[in-house]
Regions:
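Membrane-water interface segments at the C-terminal ends of transmembrane alpha-helices
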Residues: 1, 103-136, 158, 165-171
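Alpha-helical transmembrane segments of integral membrane proteins
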Residues: 63-68, 72-96, 112, 125, ...
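Glycine-centered flexibility motif
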Residues: 43-46, 116-119, 135-139, 231
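Compositionally biased, charge-rich terminal segments
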Residues: 6-7, 16-27, 131-149
Length: 296
């Protein structure tokens, strides 16, 4: 009817006007563009559609747990992957090399969400091994009467499976890159020259080959920072970890556009930061690189 159409039109106009004013979407195009750029620079992403809380506040609340998982996974991946790749290069074409190489290829190809579900199935199920909790970052029984060490132990107990699920693929990939890089360097002339001068093979390997082999490994770090959000989506969703990954998934599902856009913007910024850090580390590991000289 006419009354219903008028009511519906009035409702949508009122709602649109309210949204435009609350989220500063009203005005000429150039003002909208400049305002948006300024809000991005100042990290003012507006308020969440879900609870009207400032977006940056909710991101800061979720950031520590995502940082914790990713930093632990980062150090574990390099701590395991680099020595393992070096060992496989030294033991090339042996039974150990072939078995471990096959295993790392399999780990590298497994999707994280599938591995996460398998971990929950086998290690959080009374029918198999009920060793770890399936979700969360702490037990429901935690209260003020618990000591610091009890809370820390409980938290570590909850973090074991998420860290494993986010580390296995990284260390497998790093070990493969490290093995290839070491084998390439072992064929270089400087290795034969050093051995001809009487240096022991272990000295040549650890002092010269390893450092040069780390150069391509360093460039992989450019993908680690943006992976803090993208790579955490599956892990945090499967294990119900209240971090940025789960927040990203929930924001997309409920169409919380300010939150989703803020997380995508931060992900893009982390990509650029990762590339910058990789370039700096590349200069440290490769003394041949000199940014002060310009190519003519």
């Amino acid at each position: 009817s006419t009354v219903e159409d008028l009511t519906r039109t009035t409702f949508w106009k009122t709602g649109a006007f309210s949204l435009e004013n609350n989220y500063e979407y009203a005005g000429p195009g150039i003002e909208l563009y400049c305002g948006t750029e300024w809000r991005l620079i100042t990290l003012n992403f507006g308020r969440s559609f879900k609870d009207q809380q400032p977006v940056i506040k909710r991101i800061v609340e979720r950031l520590p747990i995502t940082l914790e998982i990713n930093l632990i996974s980062f150090f574990l991946a390099y701590f395991i992957g680099v020595p393992l790749g070096l060992l496989l290069a030294v033991k090339r074409n042996t039974v150990v090399d072939r078995i471990v190489t096959t295993g790392t290829f399999m780990l590298w190809s497994l999707p994280s969400f599938w591995v996460g579900m398998l971990l929950i199935l086998f290690f959080c199920n009374k029918e198999f091994f009920y060793w770890f909790p399936a979700s969360g970052i702490r037990s429901l029984q935690v209260d003020a009467t618990w000591s610091f060490w009890e809370i820390l132990t409980d938290h570590i107990h909850h973090m074991v499976l998420p860290v494993i699920a986010s580390t296995y693929s990284s260390f497998a990939g790093i070990s493969r890159f490290m093995r290839t890089s070491v084998l390439d360097n072992l064929q270089q002339d400087y290795v034969r020259t050093a051995e001809a001068k009487g240096l022991r093979s272990s000295v040549v390997l650890l002092r010269h080959v390893v450092r040069n082999s780390l150069i391509p490994i360093v460039t992989l770090m450019a993908n680690l920072l943006p992976g803090m959000i993208a790579g955490s989506v599956f892990i945090e969703t499967i294990f119900t970890i209240p971090g940025l990954g789960l927040l990203s998934f929930q924001s997309v599902i409920i169409r919380d556009y300010p939150m989703a856009m803020a997380l995508f913007f931060i992900g893009g910024g982390l990509s650029l930061l990762g590339i910058l850090i990789a370039d700096i580390l590349l200069k440290i590991t490769d003394p041949r690189i000199d940014f002060s000289k310009t190519q003519t």
